[in-house]
Amino acid sequence: MKLVVVQFFIISLLLTSSFSVLSSADSSCGGKCNVRCSKAGQHEECLKYCNICCQKCNCVPSGTFGHKDECPCYRDMKNSKGGSKCP
């Protein structure tokens, strides 16, 4: 019985720590993407793709435009037509 309780406790700790890592990544992406998309004409679409790229690459270039060399993964993601996926 004690072994089951210990196993449950360890699994709970692991799950809790992984959720906190995911939520902190989401919150940092949200803030960076809000800055990145602040001057975009289609703000919601910009945020959608910026967050997708940020979650995959773990970075967002500074500023509202350009500076993609700061984040090669973000820069190199392409859409189905071969254009830049990330704003």
Curated annotation (Swiss-Prot):
Keyword NADP: no
Any Pfam family: GASA
A single Gene Ontology CC term: extracellular region
Predominant location category: secreted
Keywords: Disulfide bond, Gibberellin signaling pathway, Secreted, Signal
Post-translation changes: Six disulfide bonds may be present.
Signal peptide: 1-25
Keyword Disulfide bond in annotation: yes
Residue intervals passing through the bilayer: none
InterPro entries: GASA
Cell compartment(s), UniProt: Secreted
Protein origin, superkingdom: Eukaryota
Family listed: Belongs to the GASA family.
Protein name in the entry: Gibberellin-regulated protein 8
Species: Arabidopsis thaliana (Mouse-ear cress)
Lineage of producing organism: Eukaryota, Viridiplantae, Streptophyta, Embryophyta, Tracheophyta
